[in-house]
Amino acid sequence: KDAQATLLQQFEAAYNAKFSSTRGIEQATAMYYLEKLVNLENADAAWLLYQILGEEGASQRFMRLAALGDVAEAQLAFAMSTESPEKREKWLVRAASQQYLPAQAALADWYLLHGQQHLAKPLLAATATLDMQSAFKYARLLWDEGEHQQAKEHFTFAAKQGHAQAEKALEAVQLYTPYTLGQLASQPTPPTWLDNPDCLQRIQPFATSLATIMRAHSLYSSFKADTRLQALSICLAKPIWLQADALNCHPNYQNTGVLGCNITPLSNIAKKHKFSHAVVVSEQGKANVQNGVMYLDISDAYSVFVHELAHFAGFADEYPIGRSMANKLC
């Protein structure tokens, strides 16, 4: 085993040096002896041979043997190569258990994708000080759990590393404060449009999470900078950040197939703030307009917002409408 380890060290050094002549080991020689070691079920040799041959030229057998031999890099590669969710999670867990940073980050992403934040959190905690993407995701989890000061620290770390979304998160928490419906009702009426005769449409955006207030602020900023719309009699207020339990929203609201919310709690706010239309930015769902309320999710581009804005002006749609719908509308 010592002899095998010595050979592997020499071959790995030659591989890292791209088999330059100064190392004295040619690629063909290394591959010959690595094949011999693979036949002895040497997992590290299998992984090195897989790397030398490349993904296209290597046999899956080398990757699998290396993974079975607890080579963390191979376990991660093997996990990402399978289409089976069960196998992927199994090999991600095995690789992450060896404290392999990329595997821990990948497993955290897997858990987040499947809504298992409680499993992702300890993995992100372990990698947050080493990786800006993990720091950002960990900060998001902390914020949602009410650990705002810790969240800001990790957002700051990620932002200093150049993470653009972390910078936007810090901007959002500096500009906005989440309100309960009761707190919002006690706030003074914004003076923006009360004395402005050009505000024939007074639109108030709402958000209920850090992610959605970030998106709402981005839409608000884009609208303010959009010279195409400045001549219209439309006024858009600064977004309001409501606490998470203020609105009951669902991506398939009342089985309609589109995003929607129970907006009854906003009725008193609408009377006090004098807005004629509302925009609700939610986590997920298909954009639409219903009864003077525009529903968007965090993935909707500014162009979608402008498209839906046309519905507020009375336009049905920009494409031909079917006969039955045309008869109904006209």
Where are these regions (language model features)?
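Propeptide-to-catalytic entry region of secreted or membrane-anchored zinc metalloproteases
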Residues: 143, 152-155, 167-269
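Short helix-capping/linker turns of helical repeat alpha-solenoids
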Residues: 3-6, 18-20, 39-44, 54, ...
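Single-residue signature of alpha-solenoid repeat helices
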Residues: 30, 58-59, 88, 120, ...
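Active-site scaffold of zinc-dependent metalloenzymes
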Residues: 247-300
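The catalytic-center signature of Zn2+-dependent metalloproteases
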Residues: 291-301, 306, 311-330
